[in-house]
Structures are given as structure tokens and as C-alpha cells.
Amino acid sequence: MIKILLFAGLAEQAGTQAIEIDMEQATTDEIKASLKEQYGLESIDTAMIAVNESYVKENTSVSSGDTVAIIPPVSGG
Amino acid sequence: MEERYSRQIRFKQIGEEGQKRLADSHVLIVGAGALGTAGAEGLSRAGVGTITIIDRDYVEWSNLQRQQLYTESDAKLRMPKAMAAKEHLSAINSEIHIEAYVTEGTAETLEPLIEKADVVIDATDNFETRMLINDLAQKTKTPWVYGACVSSQGMFMTVIPGETPCLSCLFEQIPVGGATCDTAGIIPPAVHIVSAYQQAEALKLLTGQKEAIQRGFVTFDVWNNSHMKINVNHVRREECPSCGANAVYPYLQDWNTPKAAVLCGRDTVQVRSESLKRIPKQELIKRLKTIGKVEANAFLLHIFYEDFRIVIFNDGRALVHGTNDVKEANSVLARVIGL
């Protein structure tokens, strides 16, 4: 089980803050693509990704037990 | 001075010595909206000796719900935010020096201000200006605190040139199309949490306690009760164009700055922006629908916002009808698109 945490507008669009994916292994790109398709999250491409609370930039492999946080930067001030 | 700051001096991490350092310090606050007024008030009360504040807008009624320095009279008089802020801050603390600039934050206007500052507080409402601050901060080796908020969420990160990753290390391109306060709304607690962190970080830096700063990117949602600190220590890149060994400060380069032009006789400003091109159109339409009716065809989309009519072309151009003022047009686009 891979746990996905959605923040800001992404959580609102998806209608949930946490999603569990029943997979042993996946890459962060695969996860993004599947969320984009399933929930129509067009803006997911500009979001920051953190795996187990550590920032990842490149496409990264994650396994069951990992938590992937997807955080769109906000601009208001 | 003793009595006024006694409770802060009693806080042992600041003490007499720290208080003296604050009095000799200079903070630049870029933006006098919600984060700007909260940060400016806190740091003025704390006794930071010089505070410079720059903002391009004037006070409107919709600001009063969260932009804590402003009054109904400021909104009635449409006072420029920087001037209104200066007036209120001077009434709060007459012992400090406040400088106010009513102008747009550009490479030209910000560079001389950042050069004089010990710490910069980011209180802008758009990423174009943040990336400018990021480059100028690296160029002048000035620490700054990124902060942003929308709806019930916020985030912040302290950037110390030469030590921590910078905003360009995290975002290779300007993040575009994010929610803005005008599209997703905002509640004051989200503002105050971000600002409280920014002020704390500023106090640590100004009193020479870099070791105490928050190393990481913090994000929270005060309505949904989440808080996460993301480790970014490994993200600093040698090849980063803003802070790497061969930094070129990409956002200070002419090709990267949004081009605005007044269209003569049309009461219209045209803004051309590379990042506007990259926002997925469907996403933009969805977002703008929360403000008003969006009409779109294959080439452009069209929306009414306040007294303005905005047309956004697929090629990265936006026309803001209803103004001849570049500053105002940029401000409208910042509020509507976060550009």
C-alpha cells in the first residue's frame, strides 16, 4: 500500500486529502499520471513531491509503506 | 526602550544584546497585503530599527478582512497600501524608521532596496516577483523568507544564500496556475501562521542566530489540521542557475521578465509572459469560473473581474481592459492568476 497525501487545490479537486494505492511498487511519475487521469488534476505537474517527508525532484521509485506528498505551491500573500 | 521591549529582552534568546541588534537592523518587506501588514506590524512592535515596505496597490474593501493594518478610512480614500501602512506603523512605534515605496517590485526597484536590507520578507502575491527576490537575494547574499497562503493553507521556507537551497533549486520553472486568494479565498489564521513563522525566522536571523532557523519547507492546513515539514537539505544544486557555482540569475534577465505595454487609446494593458503560456487552459478555465463567467474559444478566454475585462490568449498574452496602468494590470493578473 502506497499512501498519497494531497495538499491545497489538489485535495479540493480530488475531494480527498489521502488516497491509498494498492501497489507494491510505483514511480512518482506513474503516480502523478494516474492521479491526473483519475481525478482530472491538470495542475499536478507543477506540484512539489515529497517521499516520506523528503523532497524529490526526479522521477523516484516508491514502495509499499511509503508516503508520497503532492504539494502545489501557493502564491497568495 | 527598556520598558517598551522588556518582555522581549526577558526572552533569553534575544536579551539586551539581541534587542540592540534589532534596533540596528533593516528589514525589507515586499508586498503590503495580508502577509506584509502582519509581518510589518510584528517587526515594528519588536523594535526592528528600519523597515522598508514596497507595494503597488491601494487599499480596497475586500482587503480589510485580513490585511490587519488597514482601516475603513483607508479603503474609502483608496490609500496606497505602502503609505497607509507607513502611517499606521509610525503610530504603533514612533522610535523606528519606516520607508514606503508605492511602486511595482521589479529587478530595478528591488535591487537597491535588497542591497540595504539585512533580511527580506516575501509578502508578494505572485511567483514572478518571488523568483526576482530569490535571484536578487542570491546576488546580494541577503537571507529571505518565502511565505505564501491561500484558503486555510500556507507554506514558508527560509533561504540563506550559500547555505540552504533556494527557490530555483526547488522549482526549475515558475510554478504557474496555483490557487490565489481571489479564486480560492483566504482566512486570516492561515495568514497569521505564515507571518508568525516569517517573523520568528527574521528575529533569529537579525539577532545572529542562523543555527536556530527552520531548515526545511513547511506546509500546513489549519482547517484540515495537517502540518508537514519537508526535508530539502539535499536539494541544493551546484548547477542551479540562481545559487549554483555559475549562477546567471535567470529572473533578472530581460527575456524572463513579463512584458507589459499600454495599448494606446484602448484603455488596455497587454502583458506578455512566458509562464502564462504554460498554464493548462482547462485548468485556468476551471479556476476562473469561481470568479465569474468564463467564455472561451480555440484561441482565447475571456472573463470579467471587478471593473476589468481580461482576455487571455493561448500564446501567453493577456489583455487587461479597463486600465491604462501597467501596475494595476499586473496587480489584477496576480490576484486572478497568481502571475
UniProtKB/Swiss-Prot annotation, chain A:
GO BP, one annotated term: Mo-molybdopterin cofactor biosynthetic process
Chain positions with Glycyl adenylate modification: G77
Domain of life: Bacteria
InterPro entries for the chain: Beta-grasp_dom_sf (IPR012675), MOCS2A (IPR044672), Mopterin_synth/thiamin_S_b (IPR016155), ThiS/MoaD-like (IPR003749)
Sorted UniProt keywords: Molybdenum cofactor biosynthesis, Nucleotide-binding, Phosphoprotein
Gene Ontology annotations for the cellular component aspect, listed alphabetically: molybdopterin adenylyltransferase complex
One Pfam family recorded for the sequence: ThiS
Subunit structure: Heterotetramer of 2 MoaD subunits and 2 MoaE subunits. Forms a stable heterotetrameric complex of 2 MoaD and 2 MoeB during adenylation of MoaD by MoeB. During catalysis MoaD shuttles between the two heterotetrameric complexes.
Functional note: Involved in sulfur transfer in the conversion of molybdopterin precursor Z to molybdopterin.
Protein name (Swiss-Prot/TrEMBL): Molybdopterin synthase sulfur carrier subunit
Gene coding for it: moaD
Swiss-Prot record, chain B:
Binding site for ATP: A34, D55, S62, N63, L64, Q65, R66, K81, D125, N126
Name of one Pfam family that matches: ThiF
NCBIfam families, alphabetized: PRK12475.1 (NF009123)
Record pathway: Cofactor biosynthesis; molybdopterin biosynthesis
Highest taxon above the source species: Bacteria
Binding site for Zn(2+): C166, C169, C240, C243
Co-factor requirement: Zn(2+)
Keywords: ATP-binding, Metal-binding, Molybdenum cofactor biosynthesis, Nucleotide-binding, Nucleotidyltransferase, Transferase, Zinc
Key word S-adenosyl-L-methionine present: no
Organism this protein belongs to: Bacillus subtilis (strain 168)
Cellular component annotations (GO), alphabetically ordered: cytoplasm; cytosol
One GO-annotated biological process of the protein: Mo-molybdopterin cofactor biosynthetic process
Cofactor binding, per record: Binds 1 zinc ion per subunit.
EC number, UniProt record: 2.7.7.80
Function text: Catalyzes the adenylation by ATP of the carboxyl group of the C-terminal glycine of sulfur carrier protein MoaD.
Reaction catalysed by this enzyme: [molybdopterin-synthase sulfur-carrier protein]-C-terminal Gly-Gly + ATP + H(+) = [molybdopterin-synthase sulfur-carrier protein]-C-terminal Gly-Gly-AMP + diphosphate
Protein name in the entry: Molybdopterin-synthase adenylyltransferase
Family: Belongs to the HesA/MoeB/ThiF family.
Complex formation: Homodimer. Forms a stable heterotetrameric complex of 2 MoeB and 2 MoaD during adenylation of MoaD.
Lineage, top ranks: Bacteria, Bacillati, Bacillota, Bacilli, Bacillales
GO MF, one example: ubiquitin-like modifier activating enzyme activity
